[in-house]
Amino acid sequence: MANTENCPKVGIVMGSDSDMPVMAKAADILEELGIPYEMTVISAHREPDVFFEYAKSAEEKGFKVIIAGAGMAAHLPGMCAAIFPMPVIGIPMHTTSLGGRDSLYSIVQMPSGIPVATVANAGLLAAKILATSDAELLGKLKAYSTKLKEQVEAKDAKLQEIGYKAYLEGMKK
């Protein structure tokens, strides 16, 4: 489900629906910050013509960033970066054979001139990229950071009040 209030600014693409639980985290933060996006499943290997059309049309659709997740050979993020002229954030997926190391290496070891950012918090990085030219979004990101800070402060206050043993016990519930 995409936020369709405006033209999507972020494309979220994954090679398989099994990647959805991880990719949904990026969608969740984009929704929280009010950033319109489009989410789709495309296999770069099984439907290359559909993939090429997606990557070629992304700029025309208004995308400013693509978040691409893939496992195993994980060519999806790199191929997006080869075609799409704006930032691509790659998310390596866990795999059963190598625990995701194959995906990670495939995404981070790109040839010169074809960068793919590979980070945790891909949705937040996409938002920060967009915020470089959007003052309203920058304000939302600052408020989000303040909220996170306040959550940590509240946890520490609770720890100081009840002690670590009671805190740990409360975490088990």
Regions found by a protein language model. Name each.
Residues M1-C7, K173:
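Basic/polar N-terminal segments that are highly enriched at the extreme N-terminus
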Residues L33-F63, A157:
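Active-site rim loops that border cofactor/substrate pockets in soluble metabolic enzymes
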Residues E5-R46:
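Glycine-rich phosphate/diphosphate-binding loop of Rossmann-like nucleotide-binding domains
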Residues D19-M23, E47-F51, A70-M79, L98-R101, ...:
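Short glycine/serine/threonine-rich phosphate/pyrophosphate-binding segments
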Residues S133-K173:
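Glycine-rich phosphate/pyrophosphate-binding loop and the adjoining helix
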Residues Y54-P92:
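Glycine-rich phosphate-binding loop
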Residues L98-K140:
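Short, glycine-/small-residue-rich phosphate/pyrophosphate-handling segment
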